[in-house]
A protein has these predicted regions:
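AMP-binding/adenylate-forming catalytic domain of the ANL superfamily
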Residues: 339-362
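Conserved AMP-binding/adenylation subdomain of ANL enzymes
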Residues: 91-102, 110-150
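Conserved ATP/PPi-binding loop(s) of AMP-dependent carboxylate-activating enzymes
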Residues: 229-266, 272, 282-284
Length: 364
């Protein structure tokens, strides 16, 4: 029986993939979705031989490739930047397993995180189910109906689907944003059979750290390639892709990701340096404020931004999606129990949706 490779609008098998690479299948008509064409064409461009016999032959050929892949950064705080990353670096942490996994593709497939999920499925001959571009009700249905077993997504995306139980899911992976123990504990209620992983990756260098909680350590193999300086993560040029947009300090690149140490070796990712604002003399982390509000009963998702103020320097403005049965008045009252005075938003409004990037991060 031919194994299913990709499910989007159509079901594409591994034989279909091989036939396309060999010129025996045309996808350039309106029947195929943009994602289906992009995935098949991306793989074909990484193949240097004129004829592929089977999946094993395909993987052997791809692993020998010297090709680079064009990636875009997430564009969370501005226009995405272009990075060129080698295929070898992109698959360096992928483990081959015989588990018949079904992966949910929540990320945009032309970003680092999307490529890594794609290649994880491809190298293991697993099935990939596209979730990107579908609304949350459709996503919930697709997770269940297609028997998705593995999900990699941002904390924000998980928050939006936590109103039903998914017993079929075996592994949950966080990435792309600050995570918290509170969210990970909540996840266990809705994904009762899933183990939880937390990944730190960047478009510039790929996957770098992994843990089962919310703290990380620098792996031994990267000890001389990653440093923490002024509470920010810096990467050496040897592990970073090529780009005309990156600003260097000698051989080092500042990711802008902030950490706080919990002991000599372990640290937490606490957000982006661009999300620190001054309010009345205090440094306020917008992501930390969001995390605190997110803990409150009734809060489904919250976004905090800042606006310049002549008296305080900045004020905080919030958008919130809450569950039925809860009021904004109650949520505001409870904020005083978890926020410092200078962290309380001056303005807070209820919205039906919060704008996200293509990768499922809150867009600021």
């Amino acid at each position: 029986m031919d194994k299913i490779f990709l499910i989007d609008k159509h079901t594409i098998t591994y034989n279909d993939l091989i036939h396309y690479i060999n010129g025996q299948l045309s996808i350039w008509d309106s029947e195929y979705t943009e994602l289906e064409r992009f995935v098949l064409d991306t793989i074909k461009r990484l193949v240097s031989e004129p004829y592929i016999e089977n999946h094993s032959h395909l993987i052997d050929v791809m692993e020998d490739t010297n090709g680079n892949i064009e990636l875009r950064t997430s564009g969370t705080t501005g226009e995405p930047k272009i990075i060129y990353q080698s295929f070898e670096k992109m698959i360096r942490n992928i483990k081959l397993k015989d588990e018949n996994m079904v992966w949910g593709l929540f990320y945009s497939v032309d970003r680092m995180a999307g490529y890594q999920v794609l290649f994880q499925a491809l190298l293991n001959k697993d099935t990939l189910v596209n979730m990107n571009g579908y609304d949350y009700k459709e996503i919930q249905q697709r997770i269940v109906s297609y028997g998705v077993t593995h999900i990699s997504a941002t904390p924000t995306l998980y928050k939006m689907i936590l109103d039903r139980v998914y017993p079929n899911v075996k592994q949950i992976t966080f990435g792309g944003e600050r995570s918290s123990k509170e969210l990970q504990h909540k996840i266990s209620d809705y994904f009762p059979n899933a183990r939880v992983k937390n990944i730190y990756a960047s478009t510039e260098a790929g996957s770098l750290f992994a843990s089962n909680g919310d703290t990380f350590t620098i792996p031994k193999k990267f000890m001389d390639k990653i440093r923490i300086k002024n509470d920010e993560i810096w990467l050496h040029k040897d592990i970073v892709g090529e780009s005309f947009h990156m600003k260097w300090d000698g051989d080092w690149y500042n990711t802008g990701d902030l950490v706080t140490f919990v002991n000599r070796n372990e640290f937490k990712i606490v957000g982006r340096s661009t999300n620190i604002v001054k309010i009345g003399g205090y440094n306020v982390n917008l992501e930390l404020v969001e995390s605190k509000i997110q803990q409150l009963d009734g809060v489904k998702l919250v976004k905090i931004t800042s606006k310049e103020n002549s008296v305080l320097g900045n004020i905080l403005i919030g958008e919130i999606i809450h569950y039925d049965g809860y009021s904004l008045i109650d949520i505001k009252r409870n904020m005083k129990n978890v926020l410092e005075k200078w962290e309380i938003p001056t303005k807070l409004k209820v919205v039906e949706s919060i704008e996200l990037t293509e990768n499922g991060k809150i867009k600021r």
